[in-house]
């Protein structure tokens, strides 16, 4: 699994990286603009991400806006809905508007409120078919 972690908080970023490195390679972005650039570069190199874990509240471009831009790029690339990257949004806020925006505007696959348990994330990766069942 090839993942992109988009997180401005160092500790949160390191925790996600430690979890996801067990399952494959991870790239890091610290804001939404870097995420968009990393997403484009991965496609240019014919090595698209399988998963993006993206924080919502970040500097430069927030996670919601970055996700909408990534979804637009996927449309521009002519991707079908079954070819788009799986995105898990993460946030410290349990805000209903943010949840709705993540799912309906950004078509996120899942949404986690920090802090969350490692087992929860691994279970969700299996549900999303990014990891094999045991």
Annotate the PLM regions:
Residues 7:
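Conserved acidic carboxylate
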Residues 10, 21, 28-41, 63-66:
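Helix N-cap/capping motif at the beta->alpha junctions
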Residues 37, 41, 64-83:
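Short amphipathic alpha-helix used as the core "switch/output" element in two-component signaling
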Residues 43-53:
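Active-site beta3 strand of CheY-like receiver
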Residues 58:
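Receiver (REC) domain active-site loop signature in two-component systems and cognate sites
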Residues 65, 77, 82-83, 94-110, ...:
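Alpha4 helix (beta4-alpha4-beta5 surface) of REC/receiver domains from two-component response regulators
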Residues 113-114:
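A Lys-centered signature of the CheY-like receiver
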């Amino acid at each position: 699994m090839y993942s992109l972690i988009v997180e401005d908080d160092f500790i949160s970023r390191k925790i996600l990286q430690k979890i996801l490195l067990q399952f494959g390679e991870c790239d890091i972005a610290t804001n939404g603009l870097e995420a968009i650039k990393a997403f484009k570069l991965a496609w240019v190199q014919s090595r698209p991400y399988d998963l993006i874990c993206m924080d919502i509240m970040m500097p430069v471009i927030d996670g919601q806006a970055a996700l909408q831009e990534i979804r637009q790029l996927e449309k521009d690339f002519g991707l079908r809905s079954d070819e788009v990257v799986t995105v898990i949004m993460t946030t410290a806020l349990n805000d209903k508007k943010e949840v709705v925006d993540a799912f309906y505007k950004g078509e996120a696959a899942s949404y986690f409120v920090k802090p969350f348990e490692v087992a929860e994330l691994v279970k969700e990766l299996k549900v999303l078919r990014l990891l094999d069942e045991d």
